[in-house]
């Protein structure tokens, strides 16, 4: 770059008597010199500037393509995430409904088993009461029978004397003897 500017400086120091030269003083330049300088800059700088702009354009296009690919990937991931969310929400709803119905079913099972258990306990209680009543009745009967028996024995012992006792035995023996003769 320095060689190019040096050549312009040397061109500016050429003798100006009747020859064509570059005036490096910008304020003293005329439109022809300016147009020549601009023409040279455009001619030589056009390729460099065009390459720079093409490179910049390619980078921008690549960035846009990458951004679009990333956006498409993000949209695809978003759709997948939404689909997973819908699936999870449906499963959660299904679990909630199943859970409520399962809880309701368990509640009714528990109520039914509890009522059956209470019914069985009531039956056991009634059976126990009947058993105890029957046992009490049997004990009372046994005591009444024992008391009646003791009373009868006491009455018989007090009423029967030995003589009456012997007569009763003889009468019974006679009846047995008569019955034996009839059966023979």
Swiss-Prot record:
Entry keywords, A to Z: ATP synthesis, CF(0), Chloroplast, Hydrogen ion transport, Ion transport, Membrane, Plastid, Thylakoid, Transmembrane, Transmembrane helix, Transport
Function: F(1)F(0) ATP synthase produces ATP from ADP in the presence of a proton or sodium gradient. F-type ATPases consist of two structural domains, F(1) containing the extramembraneous catalytic core and F(0) containing the membrane proton channel, linked together by a central stalk and a peripheral stalk. During catalysis, ATP synthesis in the catalytic domain of F(1) is coupled via a rotary mechanism of the central stalk subunits to proton translocation. Component of the F(0) channel, it forms part of the peripheral stalk, linking F(1) to F(0).
Transmembrane regions listed in the UniProt entry: 27-49
CDD domains: ATP-synt_Fo_b (cd06503)
Species of the source: Carica papaya
Assembly notes: F-type ATPases have 2 components, F(1) - the catalytic core - and F(0) - the membrane proton channel. F(1) has five subunits: alpha(3), beta(3), gamma(1), delta(1), epsilon(1). F(0) has four main subunits: a(1), b(1), b'(1) and c(10-14). The alpha and beta chains form an alternating ring which encloses part of the gamma chain. F(1) is attached to F(0) by a central stalk formed by the gamma and epsilon chains, while a peripheral stalk is formed by the delta, b and b' chains.
Top-level division of the source organism's lineage: Eukaryota
Name under which the protein is recorded: ATP synthase subunit b, chloroplastic
Recorded family membership: Belongs to the ATPase B chain family.
Gene (UniProt): atpF
Principal cellular location given in the protein's record: plastid
Localization: Plastid, Chloroplast thylakoid membrane
Membrane association type: Single-pass membrane protein
One GO CC annotation: chloroplast thylakoid membrane
Note: In plastids the F-type ATPase is also known as CF(1)CF(0).
One GO MF term attached to the UniProt entry: proton-transporting ATP synthase activity, rotational mechanism
């Amino acid at each position: 770059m320095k060689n190019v500017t040096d050549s312009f400086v040397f061109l500016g120091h050429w003798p100006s008597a009747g020859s064509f030269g570059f005036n490096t003083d910008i304020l003293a330049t005329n439109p022809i010199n300016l147009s020549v300088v601009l023409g040279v800059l455009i001619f030589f700088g056009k390729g460099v500037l065009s390459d720079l702009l093409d490179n910049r354009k390619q980078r921008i296009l690549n960035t846009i393509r990458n951004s679009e690919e990333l956006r498409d990937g993000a949209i695809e991931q978003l759709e997948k995430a939404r689909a997973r969310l819908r699936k999870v929400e449906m499963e959660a709803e299904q679990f909630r409904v199943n859970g409520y119905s399962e809880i309701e079913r368990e509640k009714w099972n528990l109520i039914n088993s509890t009522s059956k258990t209470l019914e069985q306990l009531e039956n056991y209680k009634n059976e126990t009461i009947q058993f105890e009543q029957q046992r009490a009745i049997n004990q009372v009967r046994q005591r009444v029978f024992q008391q009646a028996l003791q009373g009868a024995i006491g009455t018989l012992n007090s009423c029967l004397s030995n003589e009456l006792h012997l007569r009763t035995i003889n009468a019974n023996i006679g009846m047995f003897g008569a019955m034996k003769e009839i059966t023979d």
